């Protein structure tokens, strides 16, 4: 019990110093909190390979269950960004590729499959010491829904939207 109190006290003492350090950060983690309201859990990791270019990985998952319907989807994919300003602050443009796997069941039927999408985005990132906020405008094109039995449905339509992300550089 005393060890856990000591650890917690040390953690609280050193966390502000670690989180507010002015060291040049090459890594970041972030999330879009607004989709959490509908149960979508998402996150991203990005590493700066030079001051203007970042490469990373995005992922999300969502599960919906009701009395007669169940749906689950998981997506992951790489992304790249070009920042017009150095120090992780300002305008950026980027692109991504995602692979999404889904399954559903309901009304006596079930299915599963995968979807590939290609997307682009532009936005602005505000940095405060190690923390950041960003607003993005994005567009994605989804391919066909492929199922194991060989059937497919074309969902090749554009999906666009405005996004908000917050995160932490380390």
Residue ranges of model-derived segments:
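Cleavable N-terminal export/targeting peptides
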Residues: 1-25, 170
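Short loop/turn positions at the edges of beta-strands in beta-sheet-rich folds
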Residues: 35-37, 49
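Transmembrane beta-barrel domains of Gram-negative outer membranes and organellar outer membranes
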Residues: 30, 37, 140-142
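Transmembrane beta-strand segments of Gram-negative outer membrane beta-barrel proteins
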Residues: 23-33, 95
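Residues that define the transmembrane beta-barrel architecture of outer-membrane proteins
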Residues: 25-27, 37-39, 70-76, 89, ...
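Predominantly the C-terminal beta-signal and adjacent terminal strand-loop region
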Residues: 127-170
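Extracytoplasmic loops and strand-loop junctions of Gram-negative outer membrane beta-barrel proteins
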Residues: 26-28, 104-106, 146-149
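Gram-negative (and chloroplast) outer-membrane scaffold detector with strong preference
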Residues: 44-137, 168
């Amino acid at each position: 019990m005393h060890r856990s109190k000591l650890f917690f006290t040390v953690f609280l003492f050193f966390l502000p110093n670690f989180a507010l350090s002015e060291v040049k950060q090459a890594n970041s983690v972030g999330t879009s909190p607004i989709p959490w309201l509908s149960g979508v859990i998402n996150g991203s990791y990005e590493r700066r390979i030079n001051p203007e270019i970042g490469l990373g990985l995005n992922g999300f998952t969502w599960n919906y269950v009701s009395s007669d319907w169940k749906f689950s989807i998981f997506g992951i994919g790489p992304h790249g960004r070009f920042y017009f300003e150095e120090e992780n602050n300002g305008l950026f443009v980027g692109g991504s590729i995602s692979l999404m796997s889904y399954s559903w069941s309901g009304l006596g039927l079930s299915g599963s499959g995968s979807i590939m999408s290609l997307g682009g985005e532009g936005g602005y990132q505000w940095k405060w010491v190690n923390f950041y906020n960003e607003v993005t405008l994005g567009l994605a094109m989804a391919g066909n829904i492929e199922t194991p039995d060989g059937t497919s449905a074309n969902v090749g339509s554009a999906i666009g939207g405005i996004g908000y992300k917050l995160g932490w550089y380390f």
